[in-house]
Regions:
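Alpha-helical scaffold domains
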Residues: 1-225
Length: 225
């Protein structure tokens, strides 16, 4: 029995309709849920990962894509966990095409933000010369989730964040009326403010950001503004 088939069977055994309803409501009824919470889901994944490690190592890209296209959200979370685990420092240059598909398939903040931080951030850390090409493509896309990714992908970069690039993305999207874009701008700036508070403070005070973006950006800087 292959990994995904066994995962499906294991999930059906622990599914809970009672838990599924509030989980679906929390996600604005965007997706169907089996009602499996994080800890038991990851316990099943860990057990089956060890059992099917050879199969997964040989075919994880196809598995991730198959999982993300299943109906229930729990499978999408497994796709996310599997992608982070297997891609780590192991990217091929052409993987950016799959990563873009992952971001734009069954998209919502709970998967996109992790794909942005871990997959896009990790990929561009491994292939830094691709940064401007990839981010320009994402930033100019009509897909809002790719735009959000272009803003958030440096969340794990800490003091190595390219602040000029972050500011350029904020400038490009600062007039957006989309909640998820305004929130991303504030989040990215707030995160970087831990390492460059003066730079973020100066940028926020000199830039006409949307109120939500500004509130999020200065949450840890309000004493200085």
């Amino acid at each position: 029995m292959d990994f995904i088939t066994e995962l499906d069977i294991a999930f059906q055994k622990i599914a809970s309709k009672e838990s599924a309803t509030p989980m679906e409501n929390y996600m604005k009824n965007k997706f169907s849920f089996l009602g499996i919470k994080t800890e038991p889901r990851r316990t099943v994944f860990k057990k089956l990962y060890e059992k099917h490690k050879s199969e997964i190592k040989a075919n994880f890209r196809n598995m991730i894509w198959e999982l993300l296209n299943k109906t229930e959200r729990e499978f999408h979370y497994v796709a996310l966990d599997l992608s982070i685990k297997e891609f780590k420092k192991n990217y091929l240059q052409e993987d950016i095409n799959l990563i873009e598909k992952l971001i734009t398939t069954n998209s919502w903040w709970d998967t996109v933000d992790a794909f942005a931080k871990y997959l896009v951030g990790g990929y561009l850390h491994q292939f830094p010369k691709e940064t401007y090409v990839v981010i320009e493509h994402f930033s100019n896309s009509k897909n809002m989730w790719l735009n959000r990714t272009a803003i958030l992908f440096q969340l794990s970069y800490k003091e190595k964040t390219n602040f000029d690039l972050l500011k350029a993305e904020c400038e490009k999207h600062k007039h957006s009326n989309e909640f998820f874009i305004q929130k991303a701008i504030g989040w990215a700036l707030r995160d970087y403010s831990r390492f460059n508070p003066d730079g973020v403070s100066n940028y926020v005070t000199s830039t006409n950001l949307k109120p939500l973006s500004k509130r999020e950006a200065i949450r840890n800087l309000h004493k200085n503004l």
